[in-house]
Amino acid sequence: MAKQEDSFKKIVSHAKEYGFVFPSSDIYDGLGAVYDYGQLGVEMKNNIKRYWWESMTLLHENIVGIDSAIFMHPTIWKASGHVDAFNDPLIDNRDSKKRYRADVLIEDEMAKFDDKIEKEVAKAAKRFGESFDAELFKSTNPRVQEIAQKREELHTRFAKAMNDNDLAELKQIILDYEIVDPISGTKNWTDVRQFNLMFKTEMGSTSEGAMNVYLRPETAQGIFVNFLNVQKTCRMRIPFGIAQIGKAFRNEIVARQFIFRMREFEQMEMQFFVRPGEELDWFAKWKETRLKWHKALGMGDHKYRYHDHDKLAHYANAATDIEFEMPFGFKEVEGIHSRTNFDLSQHEKYSGKKIQYFDPEMNQSYTPYVIETSIGVDRMFLSVLCSSYEEEKLENGETRVVLHLPKQLAPVKVAVMPLVRKDGLPDKAREIMNMLKFDYACQYDEKDSIGKRYRRQDAIGTPFCVTVDHQTLEDNTVTIRHRDSMAQERISISELAGIIDSEVSLKNLLKSLV
């Protein structure tokens, strides 16, 4: 665990050092759980969003996009249930004066059982060597079975408390399992209570006439209240979807783990409207489709898993998370939910407007059911960063820091470098860069030795480096260096675009999804 924490600290430091992510308001010592994306971070973030957007709106004829406002009529949040039910169970430690989410404390305790099991497996693997069967060992070893049973007992009790909204039981679990404050090391806990996560502000020119409004805690409601607008103007027929990328805001008390949990974040959400009774079939299809989208990036299939919800949200009849293995454990990067017809029915009730769809095939009107896919851009960004960072030991004894980013998401696709800053090489390098820059994000670099320049590009995840030397002036060939293998080959300038495109093209990645 300590090794993983150390690794995560290095990733966070690397992100700031190379211009991926900065603490917001840094010169004023920052603002808790708020971050800015730097010059490389914004490019990679935009590439992630483009991959998602095009996978939704280009690959599906029945999915269109919108961009709804952050401020919306306050009654929307009453209708959606956020005013009454958008809460976290919080608990304070009297000694450290720190506040925690009770459910997270218990989930962390469950993770300790998982860690114990993995340690037993690792010890056995060393003992038995290549013939070791991890799954068989887990299912037969008495020590592992004992740990697994204790975990299951905790999980069952925790799931019931969450489903029953039993705050007293959540505290009792914390006491019974002797969960201590990570700072003070004590068990001096307050009672658990609910805390609403929405930011409230006022809209209006005078305080007397001002209206209370909220910063949206999710983008989904902007889609639901525009259901009729989109359906009618685009003549959409069910099943169809509406996609949106936008900022959301939550007053997270326990914001932590860098950009994983923030107070201002960005979501990519798609609401897919279906016939009542067909929602669970579509739920299963979108589970499969979304996992395929993640795995297509090549960050390791073993790093993903589904996690079905122990407690369903007030609007759902099925829900699962796609979790990714971060340095601090498996964590949610995307949620897929069957939201039933709750949202549209609620908005019909509170607005007084009929929100239904007339199905010509069934010759009847109904309130559609909804399948939601919701992915956090920032969490996706972090998963890419964490899976890509490596301190690689080279044969000569040196260490290079490299980001093995999915090449389609890399902020810079190709760096163009003159070997020396004379003899016309910079002019030739500029000519090549001007040829490539209309299709690929390029960087020109002529400072320091070629080796140092290669290391700089490795550290920001640039897939290709193109070096212009004296031979280039004679035969129009260049050296192209591949980031991951560090292999170099001599090619004609006319071959450059084809080689680069075959590796970094978003089109090829999208084709793999079809």
Identify what each model region corresponds to.
Residues 1-514:
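NTP/phosphate- and nucleic-acid-binding module
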